[in-house]
From Swiss-Prot:
UniProt entry keywords in alphabetical sequence: Ribonucleoprotein, Ribosomal protein
Statement: the UniProt record of this protein carries the keyword Transmembrane: no
Source superkingdom: Bacteria
Gene name tied to this protein: rplM
Described function: This protein is one of the early assembly proteins of the 50S ribosomal subunit, although it is not seen to bind rRNA by itself. It is important during the early stages of 50S assembly.
Family: Belongs to the universal ribosomal protein uL13 family.
Protein source organism: Hahella chejuensis (strain KCTC 2396)
Protein name in the entry: Large ribosomal subunit protein uL13
GO cellular component, one term: cytosolic large ribosomal subunit
One GO biological process term: translation
């Protein structure tokens, strides 16, 4: 009996919507990363993108524990000398709440072309509205 290996053209991808209201950032991100990679499926194959599409709503209501709201810093560089910018979790959640979840999930994905392709299936929105109703996403409780 041969081992079944998933092929890119035979992979079935579902759409899921996750409400991030009052969810812990790390616990939410690990489940999102797992489903983007397809590790929850029986036909998971490491070299094939078998993951599902994930739509995250209410990103502005995600929580962190302890003092991380003030202490956790996010860094970016403008590309100019001395252009290192930093922003705390509190400020970033007000400025760009989508980036908090995107950054957390990106750190859990493979750092190669396949990981970047998997990350494109993540759609994060600050509020409860999203433009993916035509895909009929299934609500996922985490």
């Amino acid at each position: 009996m041969k081992t079944i290996s998933a092929k890119p053209e035979t992979v079935k991808r579902d759409w899921y919507v996750i409400d991030a209201t009052d969810k812990t950032l790390g616990r939410l991100s690990t489940e999102i990363a797992r489903r983007l990679r397809g590790k929850h499926k029986a036909e998971y194959t490491p070299h094939v993108d078998t993951g599902d599409y994930i739509v995250v709503v209410n990103a502005e209501k995600v929580r962190v524990t302890g003092n991380k709201a003030q202490d956790k810093m996010y860094y970016r560089h403008t590309g100019y000398p001395g252009g290192l910018k930093e922003m705390s979790f509190d400020k970033l959640i007000q400025h760009a709440p989508e980036r908090v979840i995107e950054t957390a999930v990106k750190g859990m994905m493979p750092r190669n072309p396949l990981g970047r392709a998997m990350l494109k299936k993540l759609k994060v929105y600050a509020s409860a509205e999203h433009p993916h109703t035509a895909q009929q996403p299934i609500e996922l409780k985490i």
